[in-house]
Amino acid sequence: MSRRRSVSSQENDERLLEAALAEIVEVGVDRLGMSGVARRAGLTTGALYGRYENVNELAAAVWTARVRDAHFQFLDRVIHALVDGDPSASLAGIARELSSPSAVTIAALELLAMARRIDELEEVVTPDVESWLTRWRVGPRVRDRRRRAQALFALGAVWGVILHAMPKARPVEWEPMFARTTRSFAQPYDEPGDRFVAEAAGAVRANVGDASQNALIDSVSAIAARVGFDRATASRIARRANLTSGAIYARYETKSELLSQAVEVLLAQRLADDLVANTYLFTAPDVGRATASVIGGYLSAPRRDWRIFRVEAQLAARHHAELAATLDRVQEAAIRAYLEALGANSAEEHRALDALARFAQAIPLGLAFVDLVAPAVSTTDWRAVFVPLLAPEPF
């Protein structure tokens, strides 16, 4: 027979969970420590170890007791509003959460992303996500493939907007973009008779003119994609590049400087190359179909490590000022280039199209995040989303 726990013991349970949630938001899952949580809660580490064997078990408890239900309720509202067009699910409320995400939302993205590489988290997060996807008919075996594509896109939109703003938040009017998305989802759509073909896409590799530097940058990408930025040690990066740790410090004063350059080189290079390669989309006879093919290529297997690298970079930017500054600079430069490609030359035109440019950058980022947590995303026929979304709106 189990002993009844005292009221003070139960109150300490709550204090520790609240403290752990706050620590995850402040320092991230990778730097979550028992001593930091205990200090924040005003308790001893013994109080923590009496409840949780290790910090990963604590993170799993935060997901189950503090984050899961609240975040899934938010995602419920997203599907109701964007996919089902339910007027009771306020787009304005969703836009407010995206502009100023709650602690629970920030922690949810951290925990969802880390579950793929932390066993204790994976054991609770993966079944919970699968259950939610099944409940909303978003699993890989559903018959309504258009609805599944719409739901995955909706998830990518909200997660992408949040991730994109992590280096530096800026005021953006998101509600019109989501209203346009909802209207497009309600448009009639005839499923094409031909098979969806994703655009061919290769792996992203550094090309800075120095073989050793290229090797180091590519090694950062591979290691960070596997273990995250905080756990990407200099020795491991050097070993994968077939170099010594001294080769890193001969070129960079700190490991952080190397990580930031890797982000700048690989992300700026990819965004610039993609803009040049995809400029034809602005005048394509069927822009929706062409865009769907590009997105399919972006979500293909050769780009997977690079996609994970970018997601890890966005999350780490919340805790690393140098990385945040680099990411923000790269993203803003890409947005300016995109606006110029659209023909926006004046400051007024830039302001008018700013939300569109940010949405266009946030969507692929968000879909990369969806691909981390949902099965069979790469098999999605994205024409079901982009053909109606990019078609001229009926008057």
What does each model-found stretch correspond to?
Residues 18, 114, 145, 218-226, ...:
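Long compositionally biased, domain-poor regions of proteins
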Residues 5-12, 204-215:
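Short, Lys/Arg-enriched anionic-surface-contact patches
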Residues 15, 23-61, 223-261:
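Helix-turn-helix
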Residues 100-109, 117-142, 148-149, 303-304, ...:
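Amphipathic alpha-helical packing segments from all-alpha helical-bundle domains
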Residues 72-105, 274-307:
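Hydrophobic alpha-helical connector segments
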Residues 12-20, 37, 62-66, 70, ...:
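Generic hydrophobic, amphipathic alpha-helix propensity
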Residues 19-23, 97, 219-223, 363:
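Short amphipathic alpha-helical elements of helix-turn-helix/winged-helix folds
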Residues 122, 140-204, 324, 328, ...:
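Hydrophobic/aromatic-rich alpha-helical bundle segments in the mid-to-C-terminal region
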